[in-house]
Amino acid sequence: MSFPESTQLLLKAKKEKGLTFADIGILLGLDEVWVASLFYGQSTASDEEADKLLTTLGLGAELKEILTTPPVKGSLDPVIPTDPLIYRFYEIMQVYGMPMKDVIQEKFGDGIMSAIDFTINVDKVEDPKGDRVKVAMCGKFLPYKKW
């Protein structure tokens, strides 16, 4: 998968500065996953956030317009992902997607979970049998309207 030049520049500068998404999130007052989504062109920064980010990374103002313009969300490669980590999420939805849908609808009714009024957090859970990845999604429930 190839990424836009802006993504490549942001990731390179982040690596050169020895920063993590969590470090940048603290600086901006935002969650690390949201910051990563900004790097990948899936979120929109305010002018102040873009200025602070670009200054921290030592990048020029020419990226500000890209960072502050609302993107076409979900515009990543539409084929089945081949990156093993990303593919696991695809596989999880293949296995658990319908069961999750049914459980959500039993609890809430007919509707969807918002990805707009939404947060996602990734945590490391230490375990003697091998560390675990904990992903928590929290989205507003939006019932389908009848008319």
UniProtKB/Swiss-Prot annotation:
Catalytic site: R88, E91, S114
GO process terms (BP): cyanate metabolic process
EC number: 4.2.1.104
Protein keywords: Lyase
CDD domains, A to Z: Cyanase_C
Reactions the enzyme catalyzes: cyanate + hydrogencarbonate + 3 H(+) = NH4(+) + 2 CO2
Pfam hit, one: Cyanate_lyase
SUPFAM superfamilies tied to this protein: Cyanase C-terminal domain, lambda repressor-like DNA-binding domains
One Gene Ontology term of the molecular function aspect: DNA binding
Enzyme class: lyase
Keyword Hydrolase attached: no
SMART domains referenced in this protein's UniProt entry, alphabetically: Cyanate_lyase
Family: Belongs to the cyanase family.
Cited NCBIfam families: cynS, PRK02866.1
Function: Catalyzes the reaction of cyanate with bicarbonate to produce ammonia and carbon dioxide.
Name this protein carries in UniProt: Cyanate hydratase
